[in-house]
Amino acid sequence: MKTWKLIVLVAALLVIVILGAVGGRWYAGNRKPNFTGKADLYVRPQMTVDEVLAQIPDSIVINHRNLIHVVRNGLIDSDLKPGHYVVEKNKPSVYVVRMLKNGWQSPVNLVLSGTMRQKGRIARKIANQMMLDSAEVADALNDSSLLASYGFIPSDVFSLIIPDTYQVYWTASMKDILDKQKAAYDAFWTDENLAKAEAQGLTPKQVSIVASIVKSESNYAPEYSSIAGG
């Protein structure tokens, strides 16, 4: 009888140990913070899980083995969605899996500054900050049909580009970016600014040309008002 009780006791202890180990691993991957800092991940089409993991600096990972185990067991290459993602401080390893699998992108700052009178320069500036390549940008800047929807043509598209910082998704298309530009353009050209430009005998497009000629001495869009007579 005592032997039977001993067997039951040992079996119960083994179950507790196993459940504790499983629970501990689950907690480590799903609840326990595993990052001491922030990391930006850029996922391009056809990237592998290992290539994405390689973008997380070892210096911010508390338990690297746990991260590898959780991500490799929760993600496969085909789960990855292109985009810019941010690993936040104090998040558990499983957050990386959920973020990448669900496409929880974080926007990036698209900075447009300096002279905007050369399409090649604009194309390179945008392509250097986005998933787009410079050829895609250049094609859009020469697309008569696309530009017509904004009230512009390839030869005056420069007037649509207002130097500023824009929050966009890294995977944004050129149409998305031009939508942002048009919104900024329309927001700037209030009745008051239109009247100021008209008083000087200038159209909004002509004001933009003048602003470019002086090399956009400020990257802050509202300073166009000084050129428009403000």
Residue ranges: model-predicted function:
Residues 1-230:
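Conserved catalytic or metal-liganding residues and their short signature motifs at active sites
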